[in-house]
Structures are given as structure tokens and as C-alpha cells.
Swiss-Prot record:
It comes from Xylella fastidiosa (strain M12). The lineage of its organism: Bacteria, Pseudomonadati, Pseudomonadota, Gammaproteobacteria, Lysobacterales. GO terms for cellular component: cytosol. It catalyses: N-(5-phospho-beta-D-ribosyl)anthranilate + diphosphate = 5-phospho-alpha-D-ribose 1-diphosphate + anthranilate. This is Anthranilate phosphoribosyltransferase. NCBIfam families: trpD (TIGR01245). It is an enzyme of class 2 (transferase). Binds 2 magnesium ions per monomer. The gene is trpD.
């Protein structure tokens, strides 16, 4: 039996789950523009109140992947995405964007999926622009960058044009919906390994199980106990690790890796320009909390990508490329590549 928007809404109102295959049907209708804005808003609000299940999220993400413009990476060895949901409210500099250059310098291939700022002071696309990079690369160009340099940035509006269908509804609603947690699940390069930060500890285990349903090989889903959607320096971090088809939860702390606990205020910025300055200081090897948090997150990415034996080993590898300048070299190569591609 087909799942219509009306049936879905009735199911949600009754606090009953929409099964994964039913969610696939529903999302295809929404993405094809077959569901009115009023019904889309009602369904999104209802799912938020009911709380989205693993199957519902996986079904919706499956359809978003179907509709995306894919990036075909030939050599997928050590291919990883470093991504966050955003929305943690802490306004830190672009930690995961900085970490992608570090991870690439240490041997991973990073296919990062991101966008402009929605609630933060600086989105990944915003800081890349002020660093001089062109963010609007086409899928073939992103694949070439990953192959040549080891890093590529996929600007969400280019790879998910169908999102324009629901953008007006989301904008008018002005609240978090399932789409806020779908972005990190819909990497156009289908990276088999992922380091994902989430804004809510309740999402750690959920997103790890969703990634398993979507075919991820390895994943670390993390949320600082302070609400940070990265591995945090300020407190312990809850981790959901997907490996070998199983998910296990545990906690890590900065002290586990020889780092001092440091308040988030040391990482906060007010603009993309301030984020750029902090990012460049890190890539120049300037010691401090900003470098530590990047090394920690890059280390986790290197572990989940299969480059490092564990997070601690990853932190060592990340620190080496930060202090010897290799991470900064990757940034410079990437900026030069994107500018050449943009002006061809």
C-alpha cells in the first residue's frame, strides 16, 4: 500500500512510526513537489514532536541521496567525511573545516560536505571563501581535487538542488526539522567512513544506527557533554562508534590524549574573518586550545578513515603535519586548485 502525505500525517499524529520503505515513498513525493507546503510543514512539525526514528531518518536520507548530484571518487581507500549538524549554539571557529586539511595531509582522503552558516557565525563554505577558495566546484572538479590533493569540498546547494522544493517551508517554519540532521547523512561522494558531530546527545546512537542502515563501513558520531557538535576540549565527549556492523557507545576526554581541558570561549569567533585567522594560526602550528581541538578531531577522522590505529595515534599523526607545515601546504594547494577550476 502506498504511503500518502495524508496517511503519513495521521500516523504521526497517533505517534506511530512511518516504516523506512514508507518514508522513502513519502520523501519521493515531497522532493518531486507533489506535496503541498502546508502538508510538508505539518509532517515536519509532527515528526519533530513525535521524535524521528532510525528508520524514518534512514528512509529520508536514502531519497536525498537519490536526488543528489554524485561525486565519483575512484580510489576510496581512507575516504572520509568530517561533518557536523551545526546548531550547537557555541559559535566556534570552523574546527572540522580546519581538520579536513590536517587529515588529508596525514594520509586520509576527505570528501567534506557543507554549506553556508545558518545559525553559526561562520559556516564551512563561508570560511573557505574568505580563505580564497572557490566553493562552487562541479562534481567532476571535486572528484579531481580529492584525487590530486586529498581533499574536496561539496557545497550543498550544488549537490542537492532539489532542496529548493522545501526551502521556503523550512525558512517560514524557522525551527529544526528532520532536514537539519539529514545533511550530514547525504554525502554526495558516499564516503564510507564518517566523523559526524551532532548537537544533541540523544542523536549519537540514533545517527550511528542510521549510518549503518545507509551502508557506512565505519563511523564516529560525537557530541560533547557541553553540547558541542565536535569532540570537545571543555568536557567529556559521548561517542557512538560504528565498526564491523555494530554500534558501541563510550566517552572520551581531552586528558585521554594529553590535552588540557579548556573552555569553549577560547574557540569562539564572531565572523568568518575571525575564523580564518584562528584557522591559519592552527595551520601555522601555533600551540593552544585551537590547535588541540583540531588535532583531536583530525585524529578521530584519521582513526575512522583507517589511517590511524586509534584516536590517540591519530592525534599524533595530526600534530606532526600541523607542526611541520604539511597541513598548511594542503590548504594552499586546495585554494590554488579551486581558483584554477573556477576560472577555466
Amino acid at each position: 500500500m502506498s504511503m500518502t502525505a495524508q496517511k503519513a500525517l495521521q500516523r504521526i499524529i497517533e505517534h506511530r512510526e512511518i516504516l523506512q520503505d514508507e518514508m522513502v515513498q513519502l520523501m519521493r513525493q515531497i522532493m518531486n513537489g507533489e506535496v503541498s507546503g502546508i502538508m510538508v510543514a505539518a509532517i515536519l512539525a509532527g515528526l519533530r514532536v513525535k521524535k524521528e526514528t532510525v528508520g524514518e531518518i534512514a528512509g529520508a536520507a536514502t531519497v536525498m541521496r537519490e536526488f543528489s548530484r554524485k561525486v565519483n571518487v575512484q580510489d576510496r581507500t581512507h575516504l572520509v567525511d568530517i561533518v557536523g549538524t551545526g546548531g550547537d549554539g557555541w559559535h566556534t571557529f570552523n574546527i572540522s573545516t580546519c581538520a579536513m586539511f590536517v587529515a588529508a595531509a596525514a594520509g586520509a582522503k576527505v570528501a567534506k560536505h557543507g554549506n553556508r552558516s545558518v545559525s553559526s557565525k561562520s559556516g564551512s563554505a563561508d570560511v573557505l571563501e574568505v580563505l580564497g577558495a572557490s566553493i562552487e566546484l562541479q562534481p567532476l572538479e571535486v572528484a579531481e581535487a580529492i584525487g590530486c590533493i586529498g581533499v574536496g569540498f561539496m557545497f550543498a546547494p550544488i549537490h542537492h538542488p532539489v532542496m529548493q522544493v522545501v526551502s521556503p517551508v523550512r525558512r517560514e517554519m524557522g525551527v529544526r526539522t528532520i532536514f537539519n540532521i539529514l545533511g550530514p547523512l547525504t554525502n554526495p561522494a558516499d564516503a564510507p567512513n564518517i566523523l559526524m558531530g551532532v548537537f544533541d546527545p540523544d542523536l549519537v546512537c540514533i545517527q550511528a544506527h542510521v549510518l549503518h542502515k545507509l551502508g557506512a563501513e565505519r563511523a564516529l558520531v560525537v557530541c560533547g557533554r557541553d553540547g558541542m557538535d565536535e569532540l570537545s576540549l571543555g568536557t567529556t565527549t559521548l561517542v557512538g562508534e560504528l565498526r564491523g556492523g555494530r554500534v558501541r557507545e563510550y566517552e572520551v576526554s581531552p586528558e585521554d590524549y594529553g590535552m588540557a581541558v579548556s573552555p569553549i570561549s577560547n574557540l569562539q569567533v564572531e565572523s568568518p574573518a575571525e575564523s580564518r585567522e584562528m584557522l591559519l594560526n592552527v595551520l601555522a602550528g601555533k600551540p593552544g586550545p585551537a590547535l588541540d581541538v583540531v588535532a583531536l578531531n583530525a585524529g578521530a577522522a584519521l582513526y575512522v578513515a583507517g589511517v590511524a590505529q586509534d584516536i590517540g595515534h591519530g592525534v599524533v599523526l595530526a600534530s606532526e603535519v600541523l607542526f611541520d607545515g604539511r597541513a598548511r601546504d594542503i590548504l594552499d594547494q586546495y585554494v590554488a586548485f579551486t581558483r584554477r577550476a573556477h576560472y577555466v
